[in-house]
Amino acid sequence: MTELWSNYGKLFEIWFDGGVLSQQNGGADILTLIQRLQPNSIAFQGPYGYPNLIRWVGNEEGNSPYPCWATADATTSADGVQKIKGLYGNPHGNYWCPGEADFTLRRNDSFQGGWFWRANEDHLIFSTDELLLKYETSVGRNTNMLLGLVIDKNGLVPDADVKRAKEFGDIIRKTFSKPIRKISGKGYELSIRLNKETNISRIVLSEDIAFGERVLKYKLKGLCNGKWIQLSEGSCIGHKRIEHFPTHSLSVCL
């Protein structure tokens, strides 16, 4: 660990697959080492007591449970000392420990679950529509998204994977970068008035998480053909909640 954390500059994230064996159970003093060498890195399932922790969401399919609160009643689920109760977090928890949804660009039935390369498996790369759905069920459910890319025998990400990763970014930007209307504010009710009836199938919600996660429940309604209809409802919003529902022609959203 000393070699890896000392020779490659500042690391954005350190991944502890399966967690960290605590000192009480015979493990090394990883906490002291990471605090000394990479104190600003994010640690996935890192040692208990480290402040920059994120937690697993329970699968490697980009499908976060909902709700998935960024706060929890303990800071890690895999150090042998503290255990988070379930995968949903706790809206009243004392620790900031957001979920991270990891998934691969290649399907789970490819070599080693899509985390490692094998020849002649380019056909197992997910389609852009499938990847967009994973984006909505990970980032759109208040979790960080980690996309696993394979490295081929030449030490490179294969061209097919590079192409699909770019297409993935393109479809995210196409879908979300130019919303029909944006609004922000305070209070118990916010509304968006559209100039004319408009077909809508997604609404993106976001809290200012500098103040924590304060919304515990919400409802979305729309005025459709002169009648109010409920579009969706939920609990956790956090940094991003993407509500995807059947297309409606709306003039006002609440």
Regions of interest found by a model, annotated:
Residues 1-248:
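Mature catalytic domains of secreted/periplasmic carbohydrate-active enzymes
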Residues 250-252:
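Extracellular Ig-like/FN3 beta-sandwich strand-entry sites
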